[in-house]
From Swiss-Prot:
The lineage of its organism: Eukaryota, Metazoa, Chordata, Craniata, Vertebrata. This is Serine/arginine repetitive matrix protein 1. The gene is Srrm1. The modification Phosphothreonine is found at residues 241, 404, 414, 593, 600, 633, 736, 819, 834, 913. Residues 142-170, 214-234, 246-273, 501-516, 924-934 have a biased composition (Basic and acidic residues). It is found in: Nucleus matrix; Nucleus speckle. Its main location: nucleus. Residues 426-436, 724-736, 833-842 have a biased composition (Polar residues).
Length: 946
């Protein structure tokens, strides 16, 4: 073809230039009508378009808008070319169809052209026919409708008449059967029962504060298994249990058992008020009614209100705990008002319960508000309450719910633990571990499960010792500390204020010896929470085992002696394993396996991290009650105190080997515990408020490291070695809560070094102590190094040097440089930490120099803290007087950071308005304290290192 073109073929011969349409016109066959021309101006195209569309659709088998519009466009021309239209349509319609289509279309156009209206005659005829048909159809339809309507009316009338007759004949029967309806009566009875349950729970929650007896009753129902616990736990859990039971009971009420339990529980409220500690009646009733229900109710109320509110909303209700914390501030006085021995137990239970969940007063006074949250938690717990078998579900539910609400558990773990401890002193240790661990497992199960068992054991020892004011006060203080730390971090202002207020008065009442015990107990609780947290955070498995161990051992050792127990408590985490076996009964209720789940739950680590810090402070408070105050003051820039407080507890661990030193430190630490506890209350609340507010995320992230570090370090040397560096890594951020603010990443490496060095140093220091004490002492040293590194990271290497970790000090120092402001505060804290370390390590290291430094720090910090904390001292005057000697170190250390932040922290909880006013002063004080702390750090570094 192309070649021909180039050869000289003509355009006609070349198909490229040929007129194809002409060829097509020649080739195609057209209808005869197409030869006629149509004037489209005379045609009503709108009438024809529907026909075209219909016809094209019939030909193509589907509606093709392109073809239809193409035809319309061609017809819009005044004189369309029919043949060209057919040629153009052959591409869309095949030749045959195109010819047929044009053969039909053109006649229509021609007829429309002739018609005046421009409508084809065919259409007119069709329309006429259609109209006729429509009329006929309409007539038919009308007649049919009339007939149908008549029939329907007749049918309806007949049906209505028959129905009326039937109804008339049946109505008397129905009315008779319905009116008597015993169902209604039974339902009203049930409703009344439910109401009585729900009301009684409400009334109980309302009457919790006035009457712990209902709580005791409910506790007594729970007592059946932990009857031993029941006395103290009945008191403590009375508040928490009454809250929980009240909230849960409305839910369990549907069960017939529940109504009777409620009635019984109401009766028991009155009876158990006198009985409150009479376990047999409450046990028999509880057991006969449903121990699982009643105890689950306790747990549910304490847990549901404390745990469930915090666990389930855990993150969410951490703020809510803050909300509750203001009421907590209010509750503490009522707790004291309510007979401190039982009241304290109740306070502990309620304080730990309501303290953990805005406990005693918040649970009591707020019990109604908490009821809904606890009720929310109680529904799952209903199942737990419903039957002992349900209690394992509770454990299971708690593991699941704890993951969410562990915060609640954090706050209430101690109280509940104390309640459970007292309730099931025999079996509660597992129950505590399982129950609290299960409950706290989400966060507090891991964090506070250990504290929970420990508090229970503490309560066991307390219940064994007194079940009375001292242990109750210690439990309440511990619980308050726990929930302070929890609330301080969750609601550090109000939580810390209420907790610090409660703890301070209790401490002032308890004072040195009792303050030491209570602090030790509370430290054991708080420490135990942190160990468990550490254990939990260290590894779910390790945490589980160690939690069980630590709670029991701690409780047993607590029983052995208030002062040694702190160290033993830390030791106890590993020794605790023997006691945990007895707790399995509580585990039965809580499902021993589920508690591990709760403990194991790695999800809670988030909560762990938040509550771990809280618990690590609680640990500090609990562990360091006697010696830790120094470390508390030393490492405890309030958050650091919590972080550093683990280091004081490590001192106990370390000082286990030198118990006498522990005791002497305990004396000083007892003094300082009140101060340190005050600082923890105030400054740690303050920082917990500050850092819990700003660093809470950090606390959750980095605190989890610390609590883990404390857990890992305190429970086993293996964890120490394995997790000590992890703790170092993680604790760097915890240890440098200030540093966390400054920088977290550098610290992990540094803290690893410090943790390793501190592990080595601690092992050296704690060579004499047992493996547990070594692991705890060694891990405490990492913890102390870490927490001290928190303070040291803040305060520099003086304390690491004191601990014989020159390498750690440098990392910590590098950390402290990262936290420039915090190093100054830690410097003083380091001073106090070095002193605090000195009691445990004075024998190992430069105790004299550190003690002198402690005295100096105490002097400086006393003046500073007295100036800064005049308000706090007024509030804490009684407690401060007791730890006045140790107070300088604890207060000075706390004053460095906590005095700086404690004015803000303690005033914030107690006097937020004052704390706001004091914040400006605190900033200046913090600057001065930081400067002095830096100076003291330098001195401490020189002397300890030398």
């Amino acid at each position: 073809m192309d070649a021909g073109f180039f050869r000289g073929t003509s355009a006609e011969q070349d198909n490229r230039f040929s007129n194809k349409q002409k060829k097509l016109l020649k080739q195609l066959k057209f209808a005869e009508c197409l030869e006629k021309k149509v004037d489209m101006s005379k045609v009503n195209l709108e009438v024809i378009k529907p026909w075209i569309t219909k016809r094209v659709t019939e030909i193509l088998g589907f509606e093709d808008d392109v073809v239809i519009e193409f035809i319309f466009n061609q017809l819009e021309v005044k004189n369309p070319d029919s043949k060209m239209m057919q040629i153009n349509l052959t591409g869309f319609l095949n030749g045959k169809n195109a010819r047929e289509f044009m053969g039909e279309l053109w006649p229509l156009l021609l007829s429309a052209q002739e018609n005046i209206a421009g409508i084809p005659s065919a259409f007119l005829e069709l329309k006429k026919e259609e109209i006729k048909q429509r009329q006929i159809e309409q007539e038919k339809l009308a007649s049919l409708k009339k007939q149908d309507e008549d029939k329907d009316k007749r049918d309806k009338e007949e049906k209505e008449s028959s129905r009326e007759k039937r109804e008339r004949s049946r109505s008397p029967r129905r009315r008779k059967s319905r009116s008597p309806s015993p169902r209604r009566r039974s339902s009203p009875v049930r409703r009344e029962r439910k109401r009585s349950h729900s009301r009684s729970p409400r009334h109980r929650t309302k009457s919790r504060s006035p009457s712990p007896a209902p709580e005791k009753k409910e506790k007594s129902p729970e007592l059946p298994e932990p009857s031993v616990r029941m006395k103290d736990s009945s008191v403590q859990e009375a508040t928490s249990t009454s809250d929980i039971l009240k909230a849960p009971k409305p839910e369990p009420v549907p069960e017939p058992k529940e109504p009777s339990p409620e009635k019984n529980s109401k009766k028991e409220k009155e009876k158990t008020r006198p009985r409150s500690r009479s376990r047999s009646k409450s046990r028999s009733r509880t057991r006969s009614r449903s121990p699982s229900h009643t105890r689950p109710r306790r747990r549910h109320r304490s847990r549901s209100r404390s745990y469930s509110p915090r666990r389930r909303p855990s993150p969410r209700r951490r703020p809510s705990p803050r909300r509750r914390t203001p009421p907590r501030r209010m509750p503490p006085p009522p707790r004291h008002r309510r007979s401190r021995s039982p009241g304290r137990r109740r306070r502990r239970s309620s304080a730990s319960l309501s303290g953990s969940s805005s406990s005693s007063s918040s649970s009591r006074s707020r019990s109604p508000p908490k009821k809904p949250p606890k009720r929310t938690s109680s529904p799952p717990r209903k199942t737990r309450r419903l039957s002992p078998s349900a209690s394992p579900p509770r454990r299971r539910h708690r593991p699941s719910s704890p993951a969410t609400p562990p915060p609640k558990t954090r706050h209430s773990p101690t109280p509940q633990q104390s309640n459970r401890t007292r309730k099931s002193r025999v079996s509660v240790s597992p129950g505590r571990t399982s129950g609290k661990v299960t409950k706290h497992k989400g966060t507090e199960k891991r964090e506070s499960p250990s504290p929970a068992p420990k508090p229970r054991k503490v309560e066991l020892s307390e219940s064994e010792e007194d079940k009375g004011s001292k242990m109750a006060a210690a439990d309440s203080v511990q619980q308050r500390r726990q929930y302070r730390r929890q609330n301080q971090q969750s609601s550090s202002d109000s939580g810390s204020s209420s907790t610090s207020e409660d703890e301070r008065p209790k401490r002032s009442h308890v004072k040195n010896g009792e303050v030491g015990r209570r602090r030790r107990h509370s430290p054991s609780r708080s420490a135990s929470p942190s160990p468990r947290k550490r254990q939990k955070e260290t590894s779910p498995r390790m945490q589980m085992g160690k939690r069980w161990q630590s709670p029991v051992t701690k409780s047993s050792r607590r029983r052995r002696s208030p002062s040694p127990p702190p160290a033993r408590r830390r030791r106890s985490p590993s020794p605790a394993p023997p006691p945990p076996p007895p707790p399995p009964p509580p585990r039965r209720r809580r499902s021993p396996t589920p508690p591990p789940r709760r403990r194991t739950p790695s999800p809670p680590p988030r909560r762990r991290s938040p509550s771990p810090r809280r618990y690590s402070p609680p640990i500090q408070r609990r562990y360091s009650p006697s010696p830790p105050p120094k470390r508390r003051t030393a490492s405890p820039p309030p958050p650091p105190k919590r972080r550093a407080s683990p280091s004081p507890p490590p001192k106990r661990r370390v000082s286990h080997s030198p118990p006498p030193k522990q005791r002497s430190p305990t004396v000083t630490k007892r003094r300082s515990p009140s101060l340190s506890s005050k600082h923890r209350k105030g400054s740690s609340p303050g920082r917990s408020t500050r850092e819990a507010r700003s660093p809470q995320p950090n606390k959750r992230h980095s605190p989890s490291p610390r609590p883990r570090a404390p857990q890992t370090s305190s429970p086993p040397p293996v964890r120490r070695g394995a997790s000590a560096s992890p703790q170092g890594r993680q604790s760097p951020s915890p240890s440098t809560r200030p540093i966390r603010r400054v920088s977290r990443t550098p610290e992990p490496k540094k803290i690893k070094k410090t943790a390793m060095a501190t592990q080595r140093n601690i092992r050296r220091v704690s060579k004499s102590p047992k493996a547990d004490s070594l692991s705890r002492a060694a891990s405490p040293s990492p913890q102390s190094v870490r927490r001290v590194s928190s303070s040291r990271s803040v305060s520099g290497s003086p304390e690491p040097a004191a601990k014989k970790p020159p390498a750690p000090p440098s990392p910590v120092q590098s950390q402290s440089p990262s936290t420039n402001w915090s190093p100054a505060v830690p410097a003083k804290k380091a001073k106090s930490p070095t002193p605090s370390l000195s009691p445990a390590r004075n024998s190992d290291q430069e105790g004299g120099g550190k003690k002198k430094k402690k005295k100096k720090d105490k002097k400086h910090k006393k003046d500073k803290k007295h100036k800064k904390h005049k308000k706090h001292k007024k509030e804490k005057a009684v407690t401060i007087a007791t730890p006045a000697t140790a107070a300088p170190a604890a207060v000075s250390a706390a004053t460095t950071t906590s005095a700086q932040e404690e004015p803000a922290a303690a005033p914030e909880p107690r006097k937020e308005t004052e704390s706001e006013a004091e914040d400006d002063n605190l900033d200046d004080l913090e600057r001065h304290l930081r400067e002095k702390a830096l100076r003291s750090m330098r001195k401490a570094q020189v002397s300890p290192q030398s």
